């Protein structure tokens, strides 16, 4: 299949990578796994055995008229331990390479169908100036966009860093969540070829 390239000849790409049916269940699973992997999982509370103190019986068993108590760190008490205390845990989910590649292909194919993937021959800025990048994006009528280049472009990254709803990455930094997070995805022809090789 052929992809239209702004200001250049059409680019021939693989049908298996850019012409797939959209697999919603697979994309959902991979995106959820990606988000789960980003969780810190460091929350922690103390059980009655971990709270400091509470070794001595607060008052004798019988004769006071009060309810019996054996420790001041009971979960019923204020300053006591937590009944089902939260503990640090790993939330990450396993995603097979084949599933990950399948989800990426599915997303890229859907972006093409929805006309949200724009391919240009080359995209760069002369200096790390946000104003220059804004002007370039205005020419292309883009404001909510992920810019993907073949290799790390320091100037482009610095120019995009302070812009709302604009992000610049190289091919290695692209993931399923970033592809669906923006209204449009702007890729250079070089980046398209690299993505195709990566997902082959």
From Swiss-Prot:
InterPro entries: Ribosomal_uL4, Ribosomal_uL4-like, Ribosomal_uL4_dom_sf. It comes from the Bacteria. Residues 42-65 are annotated as: Disordered. The keyword Ribonucleoprotein applies. Keywords: Ribonucleoprotein, Ribosomal protein, RNA-binding, rRNA-binding. GO terms for cellular component: ribonucleoprotein complex; ribosome. One of its GO terms (molecular function) is structural constituent of ribosome. The keyword Ribosomal protein applies. GO terms for biological process: translation. It holds the Pfam family Ribosomal_L4. NCBIfam families: rplD_bact. HAMAP family: Ribosomal_uL4_B. Part of the 50S ribosomal subunit. One of the primary rRNA binding proteins, this protein initially binds near the 5'-end of the 23S rRNA. It is important during the early stages of 50S assembly. It makes multiple contacts with different domains of the 23S rRNA in the assembled 50S subunit and ribosome. Forms part of the polypeptide exit tunnel. Belongs to the universal ribosomal protein uL4 family. This is Large ribosomal subunit protein uL4. The gene is rplD.
């Amino acid at each position: 299949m052929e992809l239209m390239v702004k200001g250049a000849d059409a680019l021939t790409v693989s049908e298996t990578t850019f012409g797939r049916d959209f697999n919603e269940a697979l994309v959902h699973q991979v995106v959820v796994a990606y988000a789960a992997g980003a969780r810190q999982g460091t929350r922690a509370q103390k059980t009655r055995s971990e709270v400091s103190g509470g070794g001595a019986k607060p008052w004798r068993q019988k004769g006071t008229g009060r309810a019996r108590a054996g420790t001041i760190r009971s979960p019923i008490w204020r300053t006591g331990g937590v009944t089902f205390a939260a503990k640090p845990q790993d939330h990450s989910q396993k995603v097979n390479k084949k599933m990950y590649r399948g989800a990426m292909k599915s997303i890229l194919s859907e972006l093409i169908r929805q006309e949200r993937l724009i391919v240009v021959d080359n995209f760069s800025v002369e200096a790390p100036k946000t104003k220059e990048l804004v002007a370039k994006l205005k020419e292309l009528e883009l404001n909510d966009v992920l810019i993907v280049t073949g290799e790390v472009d320091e100037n482009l990254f610095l120019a995009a860093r302070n812009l709302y709803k604009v992000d610049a990455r190289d091919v290695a930094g692209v993931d399923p969540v970033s592809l669906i997070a923006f209204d449009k995805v702007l890729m250079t022809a070089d980046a398209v070829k690299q993505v195709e090789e990566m997902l082959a």
